[in-house]
């Protein structure tokens, strides 16, 4: 599963923060595979019009490369601030797939998208509240 959480990284539990940092890098790779299989127009025609956590979550971000670059920088900064060990050499898009049009667009999360993702995060935390940590400390 690949997740892009949309909320400010400061809101994320340590586990969600690190997982998103690791998984966000899957979007450019998935895009490259999709372009190879379907072509540019085929990929563009399948991008969902609105944020979703279901089928289409990854493809929703295919044309939002600038957003992902900004998001990746925010995730890295928050990992650094919290003192979480991560691969500082790791790049979001080493092949530059998302740097060119039509893949390099921006995105601003809608209130509805933020509501959806916050609900999902709360559901996940409720399933294992003793497992989650924030800044290295248990949340309960």
List PLM regions with ranges.
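Extended, charge-rich alpha-helical interface modules
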Residues: 1-140
């Amino acid at each position: 599963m690949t997740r892009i959480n949309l909320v400010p990284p400061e809101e994320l539990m340590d586990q969600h923060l690190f997982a998103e940092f690791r998984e966000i890098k899957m979007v450019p790779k998935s895009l490259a595979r999709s372009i190879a299989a379907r072509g540019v127009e085929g990929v563009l025609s399948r991008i969902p019009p609105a944020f979703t956590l279901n089928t289409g979550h990854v493809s929703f971000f295919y044309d939002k490369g600038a957003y992902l670059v900004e998001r990746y920088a925010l995730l890295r900064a928050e990992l650094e601030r919290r003192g979480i060990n991560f691969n500082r050499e790791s790049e979001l898009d080493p092949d530059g797939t998302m740097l060119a049009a039509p893949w390099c667009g921006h995105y601003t999360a809608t209130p509805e998208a933020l509501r959806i993702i916050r609900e999902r995060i709360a559901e996940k935390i409720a399933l294992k509240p003793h497992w989650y940590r924030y800044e290295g400390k248990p949340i309960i």
